[in-house]
Structure formats: structure tokens, C-alpha cells
Amino acid sequence: METLGLAEGVENALSASLLLSIPVWASLGAERFDRIEIPSRIKRLVLLADNDRAGRRAVTKALRSYALPEREIIVLWPAVPFNDWNDMLRAGGKVRLGWERNAA
């Protein structure tokens, strides 16, 4: 299954990619999080917004924008107490999901 992650900023995209072992694009801000053109071949989209008010709003919009009948959309948040994926990576955080090894 072709998988793609979407994070807000460049640093968070790189950090999430390292943590999850999947390709991650940056939207360059919460206000653009639902406006990225995701290729239709992406069957699993992982939304990786910041864990703050703007990030939660961005995810709500993105869920509507990116929905396709054949696409699975997963929302992941940085572990508490981290606000974003870069903070989590720098603190030595780890993520174990199960599907990350099969990601394209």
C-alpha cells in the first residue's frame, strides 16, 4: 500500500519520517494542511499535525479534503507531552505502529 505522511512544517515532516519510516511531506503551515494535492495513488495518508489548537482544526479540514473511498486516513499525534514531531524526535521518542515497515 502506498503510504504518505503529511506534517505542518519541514522540521516536523523530517522528524516524523525518521520516527515512522515513511515519506512525509510538509504543508508549510496549519493553514495549508488541507490544500496539498495528494496523488490519487496514495492509499494510506497519515496526518501528522502539531498537537495544538491550529493543528486540530487543520486535521478536521484535512479529513474532509483528502477523503477518497479507496484511501485510508490515519491521524497520529505526537506523544504527550510533546507539541510536535520534531520535539518528540529530539527527546528520543519512539513510535511503534505495525504497518510502518510495509510503507512505500
Map each language-model feature to its residues.
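TOPRIM fold recognition
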Residues: 1-4, 10-104
